Amino acid sequence: MSDTPEAPIVEAGPVGRLLQSQNLSVESLGRDASGVEMIKVDRDRLLAVCQTLYADGFNYLRCQAAYDSGPGQDLVSTYHLIKLSDNADRPPEVRIKVFVPRDDPRVPSVYWIWKTADWQERESYDMFGIVYEGHPNLKRILMPEDWVGWPLRKDYITPDFYELQEAY
């Protein structure tokens, strides 16, 4: 008998089953507090998963965001997708999560599927240093271009001084 508790088995929801039926390897993470299905996707399968979901009607990227799991742990890029249609009171939603190592934080850009990813991916890059490969204009959006580091990482050390330049 093991002293470590076993993780509960989480059954795939409707979106997870759809992706599995398309031979896309994903892991169900259950549902969030709002009841939205959450799915973990490897970064090398992200574009195939997103193209499948777009073809299935998930036509709106409500939010792309990122967070830091903690010092020495993974960075996470998240995608909240919705099927928008006429007269939908509660449209289907899903949240995709891609976990990447902080020493190699690369994820394919979904800009070419949902244009709303443009500034959202840039913000995640600017704050966490996640590189969205294939993004047409991946550069800082909030911090000065010469800023060193990624301010929302939990291991970020704030500089004592930063000299602002005069605007002309």
Curated annotation (Swiss-Prot):
Protein name: NAD(P)H-quinone oxidoreductase subunit J
Source organism (scientific name): Thermosynechococcus vestitus (strain NIES-2133 / IAM M-273 / BP-1)
Family: Belongs to the complex I 30 kDa subunit family.
Record-linked HAMAP family: NDH1_NuoC (MF_01357)
Subunit record text: NDH-1 can be composed of about 15 different subunits; different subcomplexes with different compositions have been identified which probably have different functions.
Organism domain of life: Bacteria
PROSITE patterns to which the protein is assigned, alphabetical: COMPLEX1_30K
EC number: 7.1.1.-
Keyword Hydrolase: no
